[in-house]
Amino acid sequence: MALWVKLLITVVVSYLVGNINFALVLSRIKHGDIRHSGSGNPGTMNVVRTYGKVVGVVCLLLDAFKAAVPAFFFWWLCAGNPYDISDKLGLYVSGLSVVVGHIFPVFLKFKGGKGIACIIGISLLAHPFVTLIAFAVGLIFLIVVKIGALASFIMIFSPNIYEAISLGGTQPAVSALIFAMMTLAVLAHHANLVRLFSGTENLTVLFRFGKKKGQK
């Protein structure tokens, strides 16, 4: 099969998989609609705020898994040598397509989540150790500072910058796909950044330490 045919299949299938919004699915299971709760965003952070940490973790894992499964398959399919894991074109074509499908889902009138969990799933395939460290640092930042958008950027930018540097210009198409994926994630957080700079950003409180004054 010609490479362009493989890539076309990769884009279409991955985009459609990206349309599956687990935040919305989980909220339906809870007899609600995440789009009408909290910030209105059908994504992990809003699930945490609305339904709690356990459901939020489930949402994160499902969205990461949703991106990782097709990316792994198409990474293998599109490689010149199926056992050459350094050829990452299929991985990132699939990854970007899933993210586009997640942010702009045709079945939800192009109003989806922000793609962070999906990008984490892709990054775990490419550089699991670096991604886990970045996730841990971002999680600590979230617990302390409580700003979800910035914590998310820590989680996704660190492993992808590492990937771009490690490629060293050997796969310019892959570097371009990584740049496009990061740009989409930032643009998806436009409203968060506006609120952040105006001092009105929603806080995500994972843990409450101590008790308020007057509480027994």
Locate each region found by the language model.
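Cytosolic, membrane-interface loops and tails of multi-pass inner-membrane proteins
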Residues: 24-55, 194-216
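Alpha-helical transmembrane segments of multi-pass membrane proteins
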Residues: 14-17, 97-102, 138-142, 159, ...
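C-terminal ends of transmembrane helices
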Residues: 23-26, 101-111, 138-145, 190-194
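Short, non-helical or kinked segments that cap or interrupt transmembrane helices
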Residues: 33-44, 107-120, 147-155
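Nucleotide and nucleotide-moiety/phosphate-recognizing core
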Residues: 6, 55-61, 65-106, 126-130, ...
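Interfacial segments of multi-pass membrane proteins
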Residues: 48-52, 74-78, 115-145, 157-166
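Loop-to-transmembrane alpha-helix initiation sites
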Residues: 132, 148-155, 170-181
